Amino acid sequence: MDKKLLNLQSQHWESNFSSKPEMFGFEPSYSAKKALETFKKNNITNIIELGAGLGRDTIFFAQNGIYVHAIDYSLSATNIIKKRSKENNLDDLIKVENYDIRKKLNCDNENFQACYSHMLFCMALTNQDLKDLNQEILRVLKKGGFNIYTARNHMDGDFKKGTHRGEDMYEMNGFIVHYFSENKIKSLLNGFTNISIENFDEGSFPRKLS
């Protein structure tokens, strides 16, 4: 596995976010809407969002009264979130950080009620990266906190297409995607209790996610 190639993905995303600031649109994702139901049901008002992208879910959560610490490794993306949070008068509810989540998170222990990430886990992250990230999430969550994430799965039409980049990662059109099996999801439960795994579609292709 070429780690240098995986590291170059940050430049590819930076280029795309800077040239296509509306590439994901402004409507919240299905997963954000489902997560909000969980947050409201459990009186969650303080979350960390990893891989916030262009902030469509960040803004949605803040508009519903939830404080969001939004992290992304693209400087263009975090600048766009800052701009949008100001335009929507949500500065008090959104903290934006430009950071690589493969490093130890800049957060205190037991600081958040929940962690949310939409398709971050299926980026160019090795199995070890994912295990390390999972332990960091566990560290920054309060006891009984929720870790809600989505990833493209083995039922996705693009699985095993393109160039194999090691483990369950394949590259197409310059993007490396890590595809998840149910066993992989369960392997990341160390320290967590599985509440549910839901399969769903996103987009017109559609992408198959869990």
Where are these regions (language model features)?
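Class I (Rossmann-like) S-adenosyl-L-methionine-dependent methyltransferase catalytic domain
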Residues: M1-N42, I47-K104, D132, F146-S210
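Active-site micro-motifs of SAM-dependent methyltransferase domains
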Residues: K103, C122-M123
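A short acidic, Gly/Pro-enriched loop at the edge of an enzyme's catalytic core
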Residues: L105-C115
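A short beta-strand submotif of the Rossmann-like class I SAM-dependent methyltransferase core
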Residues: S117-L120
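Short glycine-rich, flexible loops that bind phosphorylated cofactors or substrates
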Residues: M123-A124, D156
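A short, conserved alpha-helix within the catalytic core of class I
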Residues: A124-E136
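Short conserved AdoMet
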Residues: L125, K142, N190
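Conserved helix-to-beta-strand junction in the class I
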Residues: E136-K143
